[in-house]
């Protein structure tokens, strides 16, 4: 192999290694900013064909309906909890702060936070659904499922999910 061809080969290898290293570092840096979207049923029963459940401490977003009668507020602090449900189950969300004005029981909601033990989401942000136009696509897909059953029907599903 002549020296000119050898130096080009070395240069090509170095460039490919540099691109690979740069891509790896960028993906590693962005990893902490990736929040996967789940519905309550996907948290309880797993997501996709492999039924992957979120790990404790994983950042995620959850979308569903606020279960009527589930909102509990602490009178002395801004802490509160409520259940978010879909056709496949219900999950408890805890939040500290002031809720959006449009937050109501029976309304659509998206909460962003960290998955904790007991199928609980410790939310850092809660967004209330206010108009069909502003619903994120993944929430719109999740909401196509049947939400017409009474909220009481989901309490037994949530209890089963918390027991596992």
Swiss-Prot record:
Topological domains annotated Periplasmic: 30-164
GO biological process terms, semicolon-separated: cytochrome complex assembly
Ribosomal protein found in the keyword field: no
UniProt biased composition (Basic and acidic residues): 131-150
Residue spans crossing the bilayer: 9-29
Residue pairs linked by disulfide bridges in the UniProt entry: none
Biased composition (Polar residues): 154-164
Compartments (UniProt record): Cell inner membrane
Pfam family, one: CcmE
Example of a GO MF term: metal ion binding
Cytoplasmic side: 1-8
Keywords assigned by UniProt, alphabetized: Cell inner membrane, Cell membrane, Cytochrome c-type biogenesis, Heme, Iron, Membrane, Metal-binding, Signal-anchor, Transmembrane, Transmembrane helix
GO cellular component, one term: plasma membrane
HAMAP family assigned to the protein according to its UniProt record, in alphabetical order: CcmE (MF_01959)
Protein's job: Heme chaperone required for the biogenesis of c-type cytochromes. Transiently binds heme delivered by CcmC and transfers the heme to apo-cytochromes in a process facilitated by CcmF and CcmH.
Name the record gives this protein: Cytochrome c-type biogenesis protein CcmE
Species whose genome carries this gene: Yersinia enterocolitica serotype O:8 / biotype 1B (strain NCTC 13174 / 8081)
């Amino acid at each position: 192999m002549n020296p000119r061809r050898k130096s080009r080969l070395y240069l090509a290898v170095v460039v490919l290694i540099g691109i690979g290293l740069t891509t790896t570092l960028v993906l590693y840096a962005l990893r902490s900013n990736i929040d996967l979207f789940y519905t309550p049923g996907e948290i309880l029963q797993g997501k996709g064909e492999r039924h992957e459940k979120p790990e404790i401490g994983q950042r995620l977003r959850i979308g569903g309906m606020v279960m009527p009668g589930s909102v509990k507020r602490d009178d002395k602090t801004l802490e509160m909890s409520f259940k978010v449900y879909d056709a496949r189950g219900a999950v408890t969300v805890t939040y500290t702060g002031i809720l959006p004005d449009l937050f109501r029981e029976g309304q659509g909601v998206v909460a962003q936070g960290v998955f904790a033990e007991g199928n609980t989401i410790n939310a850092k942000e809660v967004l209330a659904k206010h108009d069909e136009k502003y619903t994120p696509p993944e929430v719109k897909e999740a909401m196509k499922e049947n939400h017409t059953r009474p909220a009481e029907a989901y309490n037994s599903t949530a209890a089963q999910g918390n027991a596992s």
